Amino acid sequence: MYEDEAWLNCHPDDLWIFDKLIVAKKLGYICGPVGVDVPKPGKYIVRPCVNIMGMGQGASFEYLTEDTDALTKHNVYTNNHVKLGYFWCEVFEGRHLSVDYKTNPNQRSLKQGLTVEGFRSKNNPLWKFDKWVRINEYVKFPKVLYALQGKYDCINCEFIGDKLIEVHLRPNHDIDDFNEAIPVWNDELIIPPENYIYVEDKDYNRIGFFKR
């Protein structure tokens, strides 16, 4: 299942999990939509509230000083704008983890499954990861998600440090049964390094993975 299917199959009362601003607000983060002033000047992460396309598209770090109105009265973008449909949030530091939680609604059980850590060079855009590595590490299921009304086979959560930043009602498909996945981006060679295989998997600016 992919994100568009997950949205279609989502219980109406659970659709808030697709809106990252609502997720952030429920978790008590410092955040707000376009048009709401930031509490103090500083670096914030700016993202679309809803991004069904995934891959961190549209996300960036921005220095915001006060108001975040998207347009001036002359309909001209300012240097301090946040686009309509976007939101700003405080920046978190730490490891980027993606965790699948397998659920059995009939038995009301929950089990942690695939857990991977993402690595991204500091100067890369937020969508451009260097690799994903399977890890064996316990990550507690977020308390806020126990209130979900629908029945889902898998709930995927992404964390920065211990902060939940995204929720998906489908599994992580990138690494499959492998232990490591290196994204191969547009215009890069598809000749795999030693002990890796190339797997075509096209998405935003990506043509596949080297996996092992």
Ranges and model annotations:
Residues 2-144, 186:
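Active-site nucleotide/adenylate-binding loops and adjacent lid/helix of ATP-dependent enzymes
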Residues 55, 92, 107-109, 120-212:
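ATP-dependent carboxylate activation and anion-phosphoryl transfer catalytic cores
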